């Protein structure tokens, strides 16, 4: 209330609408005055200043001024108490100043309705004490209490701590004791002050579902005021019964459930000094449970699962009924949960680049001392690309993909000559060979091999097989110009034990292999078409390509073993499949998938616009491949390269001659090591025996022998050019020396006439001079897939 005058007499006329327009009324009351002479005058848009001496004994007259943010009160000797009702409705108040007044008491809940208060100045009043509860919950930046006759007691111990810790500017003030001599308030003077000590006792160490749990809260301390339990997390987890009072409070949890696990049971107590609380968690044991979800493709494939149980269950995976041994490629990963108050754990069985061999039934077993559970799910990551009978006639009948193409689909003759088959198929499997180069050279571990051979640390350059494989490395590498003379491949390829530590090469009995005829010959030996029995469970026999090692030296056997280990690991629908080896007797044999239509370069030429000219009178395909079919071919090669890049393999000899074509226009990366003999003009001999495919190499590989996944991207751009020229040789009009000059000077191959601009843009993205600026194989594959699914309308207006 205002002393001596009512609100109306001071110009505080409340509008009929209520208290919400108090500030508006205050501002209007003084708007026309040169200087305000009322008890309280507005300051700025949302402030109020009350300085007329002795005019206020309470602040309740301000209730309802909802937009008030700053209140300044001075020289009000009759204002002695501040209760929580006084500031009701002032929810926006941020600064409160009451100075040089008669304030003696501030209620512990005085600021309940002003949660945004950040500046509090109560200096030069008659305060002897101030409860810690008064400022609890406020985000104070400044608290000023100087000039008050504070009485040193435990009730101000919190203020002493604030002064010691430098909080809210308290340490910058001079606080006085109300005792004689006007002494300073000493820091830590009363060492007997302290917050209550709270302990919770729980005699039940082992609790199961349905049990009753007894807890007791013991409280110690001076001037105890209140104590109680906080049980907000226990709703539905148990029936609660409370009993007792200070200093000992009891709690019974009746018929507990598993939901009680990891829920906090809290006991708190207060005194003049402050508040203390302690929490415990009751562990309720219950059997394991498990749930499995369907496999989801993420960065790695994920088979999601959820497991529950207390104690936390142990986990074990089965694959098709057998124990699944986890590796760096197949592993369990738990997901971090934002919820910390539950026992259920969520996670994934991660599979890095799974293939059809990983298709099957996955079972998760969970067990703890109170029970076990299991759940199973079928997962199919990739279709099996080998489900066909290789002895059946294989017509090249393509479904037209390009809706705008008018060309007829090519059809293959059933009666192919053995030599035609040999060349077509022969080049099919050595993807394996070039893939291994990296391994041949590098094993310095000297361990006993699975073939009974001691591995040397370095391969000699004379080894024919080493030379046939030296175009495949792990990661990036660089070769010296003298490679192929005396240095061999020493030091250029390091073995990654991650890939080969547990490689299991399949051994095939020699009696199950029946050679039919020779397909071709490379530096390593000969390649044969053969029948193989008992190779697959669902077939008695099947056609395969067999590579025979002609040299039986220790080094050659070493290379043979290393290559077999590498090829066993590579499993992808667009990498030629390796079935295993035969080491009984001699010669050593490798067994590969049979690709009937041979290498991609020859296939493109025989299905291109110049097919009749190249055939020399023989029957040819009825028409060139359409745009949709060319895009499908390119997309498949890109898919294989994405797989190799994911394993950090560098191909180093990617070209259409080293890709193979099978039934239904299925294209795979692979050759039998014969391409350097059949396509000798594609290679440039350096030094003694080193042959480099310079027309497919980027500048850094030509100049510095630096090979990386980025150099493979460049080579793929050239492969794309080959596909859309129907197998032409890059820079066919130039010699090797002239081609090197064009590449190193930054010239690019011209856009083929059958190539849409979108595809040529991909080629150019692969041919950026700086390796880091080239497209990634993933990006290339994604773009080609999108184009293959919806081929662009393209008309060769120049043709």
From Swiss-Prot:
The pro-survival signaling effect of NTRK1 in neurons requires its endocytosis into signaling early endosomes and its retrograde axonal transport. This is regulated by different proteins including CFL1, RAC1 and SORT1. NTF3 is unable to induce this signaling probably due to the lability of the NTF3-NTRK1 complex in endosomes. SH2D1A inhibits the autophosphorylation of the receptor, and alters the recruitment and activation of downstream effectors and signaling cascades. Regulated by NGFR. SUPFAM superfamilies: Immunoglobulin (SSF48726), L domain-like (SSF52058), Protein kinase-like (PK-like) (SSF56112). Ligand-mediated autophosphorylation. Interaction with SQSTM1 is phosphotyrosine-dependent. Autophosphorylation at Tyr-499 mediates interaction and phosphorylation of SHC1. N-glycosylated. Residues 513-784 form the Protein kinase domain. Residues 442-799 are cytoplasmic. The chain crosses the membrane at residues 421-441. ATP binds at residues 519-527, 547. It catalyses: L-tyrosyl-[protein] + ATP = O-phospho-L-tyrosyl-[protein] + ADP + H(+). The keyword Cell division does not apply. LRR repeats lie at residues 90-113, 116-137. One of its GO terms (molecular function) is protein homodimerization activity. Residues 1-33 form the signal peptide. The record marks 794 as: Interaction with PLCG1. Its main location: membrane. GO terms for cellular component: axon; cell surface; cytoplasm; dendrite; early endosome; early endosome membrane; late endosome; late endosome membrane. Belongs to the protein kinase superfamily. Tyr protein kinase family. Insulin receptor subfamily. The transmembrane domain mediates interaction with KIDINS220. This is High affinity nerve growth factor receptor. It comes from Mus musculus (Mouse). The lineage of its organism: Eukaryota, Metazoa, Chordata, Craniata, Vertebrata. The gene is Ntrk1.
């Amino acid at each position: 209330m205002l002393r001596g005058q009512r609100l109306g007499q001071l110009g505080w006329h409340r509008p009929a609408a209520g208290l919400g327009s108090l500030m508006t009324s205050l501002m209007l009351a003084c708007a026309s005055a040169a200087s305000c002479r009322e008890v309280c005058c507005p300051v700025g848009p949302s402030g109020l200043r009350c300085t007329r001496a002795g005019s206020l004994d309470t602040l309740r007259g301000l209730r309802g001024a909802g937009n008030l943010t700053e209140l300044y009160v001075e020289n009000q000797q009759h204002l002695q108490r501040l209760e929580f009702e006084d500031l009701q409705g002032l929810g926006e108040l941020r600064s409160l100043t009451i100075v040089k007044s008669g304030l003696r008491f501030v209620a512990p809940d005085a600021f309940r309705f002003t949660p945004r208060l950040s500046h509090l100045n109560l200096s030069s009043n008659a305060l002897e004490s101030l409860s810690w509860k008064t400022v609890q919950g406020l985000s104070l930046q400044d608290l000023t209490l100087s000039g008050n006759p504070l009485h040193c007691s435990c009730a101000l111990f919190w203020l002493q701590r604030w002064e010691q810790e430098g909080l809210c500017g308290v340490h910058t003030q001079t606080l006085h004791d109300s005792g004689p001599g006007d002494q300073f308030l000493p820091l830590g003077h009363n060492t007997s002050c302290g917050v209550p000590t709270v302990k919770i006792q729980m005699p039940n160490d082992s609790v199961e579902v349905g049990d009753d749990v007894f807890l007791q809260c013991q409280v110690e301390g001076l001037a105890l005021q209140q104590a109680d339990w906080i049980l907000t997390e226990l709703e539905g987890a148990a029936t609660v019964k409370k009993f007792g009072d200070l200093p000992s409070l009891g709690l019974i949890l009746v018929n507990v459930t598993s939901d009680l696990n990891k829920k906090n049971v809290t006991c708190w107590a207060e005194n003049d000094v402050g508040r203390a609380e302690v929490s415990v968690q009751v562990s309720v044991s219950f059997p394991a449970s498990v749930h499995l979800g369907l496999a989801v493709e993420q960065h790695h494939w994920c088979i999601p699962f959820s497991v529950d149980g207390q104690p936390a269950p142990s986990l074990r995976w089965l694959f098709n009924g057998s124990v699944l041994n986890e590796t760096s490629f197949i592993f369990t990963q738990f997901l971090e949960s934002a919820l910390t108050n539950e026992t259920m754990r969520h996670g994934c069985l991660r599979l890095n680049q799974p293939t059809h061999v990983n298709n099957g039934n996955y079972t998760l077993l969970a067990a703890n001392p109170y029970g076990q559970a299991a759940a199973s799910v079928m997962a199919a990551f990739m279709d099996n690309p080998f489900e066909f009978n290789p002895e059946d006639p294989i017509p090249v009948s393509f479904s037209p993909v390009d809706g705008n193409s008018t060309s007829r689909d090519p059809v293959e003759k059933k009666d192919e000559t053995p030599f035609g088959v040999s060349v077509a198929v022969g080049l099919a499997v050595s993807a394996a060979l070039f893939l291994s180069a990296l391994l041949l050279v590098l094993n310095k571990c000297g361990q006993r091999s699975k073939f009974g051979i001691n591995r040397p640390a370095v391969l000699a350059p004379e080894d024919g097989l080493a030379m046939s494989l030296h175009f495949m490395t792990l990661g990036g590498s660089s070769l010296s110009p003298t490679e192929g003379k005396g240095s061999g491949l020493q030091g250029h390829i390091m073995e990654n034990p991650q890939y080969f530590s547990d490689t299991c090469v399949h051994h095939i009995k020699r009696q199950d292999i029946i050679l039919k005829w020779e397909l071709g010959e490379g530096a390593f030996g000969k390649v044969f078409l053969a029948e193989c029995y008992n190779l697959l469970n669902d077939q008695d026999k099947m056609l395969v390509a067999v590579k025979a090692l002609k040299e039986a030296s220790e080094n050659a056997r070493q290379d043979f073993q290393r290559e077999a280990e590498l090829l066993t690991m590579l499993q992808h629908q667009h990498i030629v499949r390796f079935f295993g080896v035969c080491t009984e007797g001699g010669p050593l044999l490798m067994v590969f998938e049979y690709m009937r239509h041979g290498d991609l370069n020859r296939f493109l030429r025989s299905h291109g616009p110049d097919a009749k000219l190249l055939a020399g009178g023989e029957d040819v395909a009825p028409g060139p491949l359409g745009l949709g079919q060319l895009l499908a071919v390119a997309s498949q090669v890109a898919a294989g390269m994405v797989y190799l890049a994911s394993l950090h393999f560098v191909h180093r000899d990617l070209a259409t001659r080293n890709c193979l074509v099978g039934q239904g226009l299925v294209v795979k990366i692979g050759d039998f090591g014969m391409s350097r003999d059949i396509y000798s003009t594609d290679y440039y001999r350096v030094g003694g025996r080193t042959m480099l495919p310079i027309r497919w190499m980027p500048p850094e590989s030509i100049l510095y022998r630096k090979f990386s996944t980025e150099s493979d991207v460049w080579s793929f751009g050239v492969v794309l050019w080959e596909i859309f020229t129907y197998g032409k040789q890059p820079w066919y009009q130039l010699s090797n020396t002239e081609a090197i000059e064009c590449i190193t000077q930054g010239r690019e191959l011209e856009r083929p006439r059958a190539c849409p601009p979108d595809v040529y843009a991909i080629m150019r993205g692969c041919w950026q001079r700086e390796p880091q600026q080239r497209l990634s194989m993933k990006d290339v594959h994604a773009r080609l897939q999108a184009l293959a699914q919806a081929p662009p309308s393209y008309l060769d207006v120049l043709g």
